Amino acid sequence: MARRLQDELSAFFFEYDTPRMVLVRNKKVGVIFRLIQLVVLVYVIGWVFVYEKGYQTSSDLISSVSVKLKGLAVTQLQGLGPQVWDVADYVFPAHGDSSFVVMTNFIVTPQQTQGHCAENPEGGICQDDSGCTPGKAERKAQGIRTGNCVPFNGTVKTCEIFGWCPVEVDDKIPSPALLREAENFTLFIKNSISFPRFKVNRRNLVEEVNGTYMKKCLYHKIQHPLCPVFNLGYVVRESGQDFRSLAEKGGVVGITIDWKCDLDWHVRHCKPIYQFHGLYGEKNLSPGFNFRFARHFVQNGTNRRHLFKVFGIHFDILVDGKAGKFDIIPTMTTIGSGIGIFGVATVLCDLLLLHILPKRHYYKQKKFKYAEDMGPGEGEHDPVATSSTLGLQENMRTS
């Protein structure tokens, strides 16, 4: 064992490998070698240089988004009467940024006041007062329990609560959606971006978009791909969803603005591409999107509110992109990497030549030569022994 370790250490410290060129005339190996080189060449030029633009340096963007909506809807509900809904009523938040909700449906509980009333059955069914612990609130409770068990209707008793009364009953969602006119609402998106590395600024209001064009255009992916005014119904359909079913229970839609800019060309060719995605599946564990808000007012000296459970479409505007421009450093790096990849052809052909072909032992004999230090002067009388010509006394050690 010690002898073997000594031999290994001796070989590691006192042996040296140097490449040896051998010209092999073999059609199979020659064809495979050139085919591999061709594949590498196509990869380097086609994929790395042309598609991935390996000759460019890149910059990420910083972005700002603002939106405006337009449209009106009318409802006629008991307790509220006829009502016109404009953008100040159905958009949350009202100032409009990259994430907002358009209300399309709702359940209203009008004229609520602070007082005592029976809890909703979801908040706690009871048989007598012993089932209602005073001061306690269940997970779905709408108030604080008083400790009394009172009739909710003719068949069910629930715990009495102190809270906003009457309690909300939200088990019947209006169908069709109350604000179905939302399908025809329009959305105007303003997007400003900057590529700080190249000091380039752009807006989605590009050169082709002017005041006259904006007054009459609506976005269409083929006819008007640069128009920044969108029909909500079109956006939802392009996301792969049905507007009417989405409007009833709500949902989430993503709008992606993609900037892929080649700054080796004029900056006017840097234009946005819009894409639309449905972010919630219909078979989700918790489908739809909803939240609550209240309108507070004072009537006859009493604080009152209208409670709304809102179902709406949550729009998220996501901006992504990258700009590239020629740079000598990544160009030389890519060229060097490509040249290095050509070595794969040599490795694979050596593997084929020395380990797979029937004459592999013969090729190994021609490929590798073992030379040992024989001391000063030894072997100098035989110039053939130091020759690198194939076929002339190459097996010095074994002959």
Swiss-Prot record:
Annotated spans, Pore-forming motif: 331-338
Single biological process term from Gene Ontology: apoptotic process
Residues annotated as transmembrane: 29-50, 339-358
GO cellular component assignments: external side of plasma membrane; glutamatergic synapse; membrane raft; plasma membrane; postsynaptic membrane; presynaptic active zone membrane; protein-containing complex
Regulation: Activated by low concentrations of ATP (<1 uM). Undergoes rapid desensitisation. Sensitives to the ATP agonist:alpha/beta-methylene-ATP. Modulated by cholesterol.
Entry keywords, A to Z: Apoptosis, ATP-binding, Cell membrane, Disulfide bond, Glycoprotein, Ion channel, Ion transport, Ligand-gated ion channel, Membrane, Nucleotide-binding, Phosphoprotein, Receptor, Transmembrane, Transmembrane helix, Transport
Glycosylation sites: N153, N184, N210, N300
Disulfide bonds: C117-C165, C126-C149, C132-C159, C217-C227, C261-C270
Name listed for the protein in its UniProt record: P2X purinoceptor 1
A Pfam match: P2X_receptor
Binding site for ATP: K70, T186, S286, N290, R292, K309
MF (Gene Ontology): ATP binding; extracellularly ATP-gated monoatomic cation channel activity; identical protein binding; ligand-gated calcium channel activity; monoatomic cation channel activity; nucleotide binding; protein-containing complex binding; purinergic nucleotide receptor activity
Subunit structure: Functional P2XRs are organized as homomeric and heteromeric trimers. Homotrimer. Forms heterodimer with P2RX2. Forms heterodimer with P2RX4. Forms heterodimer with P2RX5.
Organism name: Rattus norvegicus (Rat)
Region span, Disordered: 374-399
Residue ranges annotated as Cytoplasmic topological domain: 1-28, 359-399
